[in-house]
Amino acid sequence: MNKLRVIGNDLVKYYEIDLTDYLPLTSKAFRIIDKTGKQYFVKETLPNTLEKYQFLYNQGLTNILYPLKNFEQKFVTRNPLASFYVSNFYDDTTIISEPKAQHMLNELDNLHEKTSFKRQLNPMTSRPKFEELTNRLDYKFKMLENYIRSVEAKPLNMYSMPVLANYQYVLDAKKELVRLQKRIISSIKAKDSIDYSFVHNNPRLEHTINYNGSYYLISLDNGKIGVESLDFAKFYIENENLNLDFKNIFINHFKGLNPFYYDYFRYLVLLIYISRLDVASDEYINAEIFISTTNSIKKYFTNFQDVNEDDE
């Protein structure tokens, strides 16, 4: 209730909402009820969320459920202690996840297409980012290698056997990341012209809802200007266990486009998987996370091999 106390006066001042009851949904989001019984969704956010929603509104995006405008005609209310927005509360009940996932992909496509603009890849800004990623990956792979060596030096048991058996997929991911990074850097050096757009950056299924028979995107607080591959990589990882033909979905999507998009998509998927493997020391790793992650990497190689491309 502390956060609601901070914004409670502003709910009255900027929205004429007199709070009578609430239900926490997350640490920053609440379902609230006013004195008339009407329900709202209130979420604490960052101050720059205002500019994001205003940008999308000005671009004419109609597949977004925007927050309610306050009395200053702004989507986000900002004060020295907190920034927040208010939306009508929509009770979205989804029985089958697969159709909803497909609808979200459609709405992400719509978002990217309507905010798209051309920009050349810039070696000056991209090189430091990839050098940082390379250093992080090198450190992570070194820690994993040391950990596996420590496991091999001990007697086999029910814990160590599946870890050792699945380590090959980590090595496969390492080789693939090097190969993809080489290709991405080639695109950067060539200063390829790439479509940038507004990416949702948190494309979880609960961030699309069905309202009056149409699907809308919500919770774009983390959105930013970037390459669509980021949204698709995060979407795939969030939903990889659904019964969807991801192989054909993404091959068909990237077919005919600059190979950079598909390379970057695959690079990000593997990067996120490897980042999951938190090696606390040479002696310990969470076996359950290791097995599930390496199984995901194995599935990656089934879904996302090169198509009509020469292996490098």
Question: How would you describe each model-predicted region?
Answer:
Residues 1-18, 47, 168, 175, ...:
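Regulatory N- and C-terminal appendages and interdomain linkers associated
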Residues 5-35, 70:
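ATP-binding glycine-rich phosphate-binding loop
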Residues 29, 67, 179-232:
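Active-site acidic catalytic loop and adjacent metal/ATP-binding pocket
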Residues 35-125:
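ATP-binding pocket architecture of kinase catalytic cores
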Residues 82-97, 145-153, 273-291:
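A glycine-centered beta->alpha junction motif in the catalytic cores
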Residues 124-198, 249, 303:
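ATP-dependent phospho-/nucleotidyl transfer catalytic cores
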Residues 228-259, 272-300:
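Active-site activation/catalytic loop segments of kinase-like enzymes and analogous catalytic loops
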